[in-house]
Amino acid sequence: MIRVIQPPLIASKQLFRRYLATGGTFTNKTSQLDRATLTIKDGPVFSGYSFGANKNISGEAVFTTSLVGYPESMTDPSYKGQILCFTQPLIGNYGVPSSTLKDEFNLLKHMESPSVQCIGIVVADVALEYSHWTAVESLQQWCQRSGVAAISGVDTRQLVSYLREKGSSLAKITIGEEYDADEDAAFEDPGSVNLVHKVSTKAPFHISCPEKYAKGLHIAVLDCGAKENILRCLVERGASLTVFPYNYPIDKIANKFDGIFISNGPGDPTHCSSTTENLAKTMEKYHDLPIFGICLGHQLLALASGARTIKMKYGNRAHNIPALDLTTGKCHITSQNHGYSVDAETLDSDWEPYFTNLNDLSNEGMKHKSRPIFSTQFHPEAKGGPLDTAFLFDKFFENIEQYRATNGLNLGNVDDSLLVDILPKGRVL
């Protein structure tokens, strides 16, 4: 028998205070919203209210325990195809900032990609009214404008308890007054397709470094779904970037750059076999070339070196996960968003673990024992989250400077065959 869990009459202390302050008049606007249902495949059914796009959707239900940063999370390409549940009870209270405003590097100032990447969101209580000096619209308006399904009034504590016990599950959000268990909308598994292909640039593009930051460095970026703040962290340290599609044969031109960076991204890393093959060739041909990978980039680098990746039960998605630096013994608080991890037991003898998750003891990084190559499962750039490990970008740049000094070459300018001057200046979708 399927149990339908009804939304609470008053979903939060905030609404209860409002209820008392108005003399017992319930002033929340959820009564004006359409009813909606969140259905977990082979699991519970939650009834709530729709405040997003008026459409039915299906995807993988995951959760984040991050307290803030919902605009950044929702535009993170790593969430492509997923239904994101926020454990923070009240979401939307500071609204949504501009999704088009750019900074001095021509990168989005507030968002991590040009569009919302998750297919739907689940919250306990949505703030339909907002207050913040950077906000230009409400979360409701943004979801509706972006075509994102959104449901509020859900018992997110019970939902997260289920996902922690059973693991990340397929789910769907349907709009309508009555739940129909025989509804023909199928449960679609986003993990069955190559999600990286959907979020990666379709052609190379170039990001110039402003003169006041420039150090004459040029880094090649493999775009598996790169967050804007990752690109910003590279440019603000003095490098121009040429960003390539995830499956670009980087081994053929890697020696034209000062370093290679492999970005974050969504889904199963084994779907990117061409990327791992190209990385393996690159490491075989250029022994001293600095390489740095983050999140999916970490997993792809591990696969390229002969290690194995595994799907986690429910993944790690939060801004407060402790990671132990096995080199220094220091513990850092990190921002994470991933459903797969590297099996440290399968690392080749030339590699060693770099960081370990102190919550579940999963691998959080690796490094080569004799070459300037390392990677992390967590996000040193955060956005949102702590910046405890931002020093890893500095480490990457130190490796680059040493590489240039050792080779005695000025590698900062790529040859004319790449036609950097005429490359697009933004991601080609």
Swiss-Prot record:
Q: What InterPro entries would the database entry show? A: Anth_synth/Amidotransfase, CarbamoylP_synth_ssu, CarbamoylP_synth_ssu_N, CarbP_synth_ssu_N_sf, Class_I_gatase-like, CPSase_GATase1, GATASE
What Gene3D superfamilies is this protein classified in? 3.40.50.880, Carbamoyl-phosphate synthase small subunit, N-terminal domain
Organelle targeting peptide span: 1-20
Q: In which pathway does it act?
A: Amino-acid biosynthesis; L-arginine biosynthesis; carbamoyl phosphate from bicarbonate: step 1/1
GO molecular-function terms, A-Z: ATP binding; carbamoyl-phosphate synthase (glutamine-hydrolyzing) activity; glutaminase activity
Q: Which Pfam families match?
A: CPSase_sm_chain, GATase
Localization (cell): Mitochondrion matrix
Q: Which residues form the active site?
A: C295, H379, E381
Q: Which GO terms describe its biological process?
A: 'de novo' pyrimidine nucleobase biosynthetic process; glutamine metabolic process; L-arginine biosynthetic process; pyrimidine nucleotide biosynthetic process
Note the CDD domains from the entry.
GATase1_CPSase
Which keywords label this protein? Amino-acid biosynthesis, Arginine biosynthesis, ATP-binding, Glutamine amidotransferase, Ligase, Mitochondrion, Nucleotide-binding, Transit peptide
**Keyword presence, Ligase:** yes
Assembly, per entry? Heterodimer composed of 2 chains; the small (or glutamine) chain promotes the hydrolysis of glutamine to ammonia, which is used by the large (or ammonia) chain to synthesize carbamoyl phosphate.
The protein's matches in PANTHER family, at most eight in alphabetical order, are given as: CARBAMOYL-PHOSPHATE SYNTHASE SMALL CHAIN (PTHR43418:SF7), MULTIFUNCTIONAL TRYPTOPHAN BIOSYNTHESIS PROTEIN-RELATED (PTHR43418)
Similarity section: Belongs to the CarA family.
Matching NCBIfam families, A to Z? CPSaseIIsmall (TIGR01368), PRK12838.1 (NF009475)
General function of this protein:
Small subunit of the arginine-specific carbamoyl phosphate synthase (CPSase). CPSase catalyzes the formation of carbamoyl phosphate from the ammonia moiety of glutamine, carbonate, and phosphate donated by ATP, the first step of the arginine biosynthetic pathway. The small subunit (glutamine amidotransferase) binds and cleaves glutamine to supply the large subunit with the substrate ammonia.
The name under which this protein is listed is Carbamoyl phosphate synthase arginine-specific small chain
Gene this protein is translated from = CPA1
